[in-house]
């Protein structure tokens, strides 16, 4: 969890200026990147979802592998979400899963989960990940992530972290 929080703390900061990137590569909808922070190499695989009207980021999904070789998933949402209502996550036509929010900071509210191999395989085999969230005004919002390029991107992340 500490790595997820640390990662988000520098995700939106100046540390992502070009001179801090050690590696960066695009895999269709996904972007793999490694940065150096306090002499430590931090890598993630992420996808951003933009508002079609404003072109602002409304959500992002980040995958990291922690020092214990566990895969972590973090999803960021705007503050306008109802924290008491779980998020429904669905990959293609599979049964939806309910996930709870882990925390909020000044930038966003987050789901943070350790995900198992079977869940990673659903990402690899899937085409689209859909999130349904309840907003504070009780409207439901749907956020869709493409899974195109996830397998190649995850393999690249695994290689960077585990050699």
Protein language model regions, located:
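A generic "folded-domain core" signal
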Residues: 17-163
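Sec-dependent N-terminal signal peptides
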Residues: 3-13
């Amino acid at each position: 969890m500490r790595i997820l929080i640390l990662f988000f703390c520098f995700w939106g900061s100046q540390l992502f200026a070009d001179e801090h990137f050690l590696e960066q590569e695009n895999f269709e909808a996904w972007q793999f990147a490694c940065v150096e922070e306090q002499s430590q190499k931090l890598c993630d695989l992420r996808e951003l979802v933009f508002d079609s009207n404003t072109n602002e980021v409304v959500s992002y999904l980040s995958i990291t592998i922690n020092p214990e070789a566990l895969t972590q998933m973090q999803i960021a949402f705007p503050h306008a979400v109802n924290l008491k209502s779980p998020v429904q996550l669905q990959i293609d036509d599979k049964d939806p899963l309910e996930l709870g929010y882990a925390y909020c900071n000044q930038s966003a509210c987050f789901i943070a989960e350790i995900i198992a191999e079977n869940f990673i395989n659903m990402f690899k085999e899937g085409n689209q990940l859909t999130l349904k969230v309840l907003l504070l005004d009780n409207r439901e919002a749907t956020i869709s992530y493409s899974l195109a390029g996830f397998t190649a991107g995850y393999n690249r992340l695994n290689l960077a972290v585990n050699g």
